[in-house]
Amino acid sequence: MRQFLLFILFALLPFTAIAQCRYTNTWQDFLNDNWKTEEGRVELVPSAKEDCLAMDVEADKKKTAKMLRKTACVIEWGGSLYLNLRPFNTFGDVFVQAWRIGGDKVLFARQDVAPSRFSIANGDTGIPLSRSSFRSLSKLENLVCYLAAWDPQREELRIARVTAAIVAKFLAGHPAQLSQYQQLERGQREQADIVITTLQAAGVI
């Protein structure tokens, strides 16, 4: 049932009618709900068939699409949020679906990488997406989740890998979902499909 719901969720994304698109250029604007809009058609489309989450911007005006790819921090389209991964220089130059969590954080799924590769606009060229990388991105069960949040001390957006312990903290007020989650095999608890559907069932995202 879980896999079916996820399939429906992502399979319908490309066929969503031309929906209202709005965006923020900074994380603070996102937290303060200060959105901007552009005239004309602006929508998100699948970036690569081998990547189940990656999305790219399409617009009537090429300069609008180029601007959004470069400067937009978060885009809201079709009732969903999409985080721009470009600034991280780690996960590829794409937008991915994201979920707001804990008020000031965003959850998203991507390939599992070492924390040492978490670079934010520091000159790192990131991880090249090879064919094998694309194969690992084709299914949610091959991905893990991350949290993006603003670091006021460094004044930059930072990310952290979502571990089973972090998921358990988010489920602290939801004993039924927490109990079901803790009964899963340890190897499954950090899979993106498990994390996302568990948090959705608890109403956390």
Feature-to-residue mapping (PLM):
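Generic hydrophobic-segment detector
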Residues: 7, 68-69, 193, 205
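Generic low-complexity, intrinsically disordered sequence content enriched
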Residues: 9-17, 35, 48, 57, ...
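C-terminal partner/receptor-binding element of secreted or periplasmic proteins
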Residues: 165-205
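Bacterial Sec-dependent N-terminal signal peptides
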Residues: 1-23, 195
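Aromatic-patch recognition
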Residues: 22-177
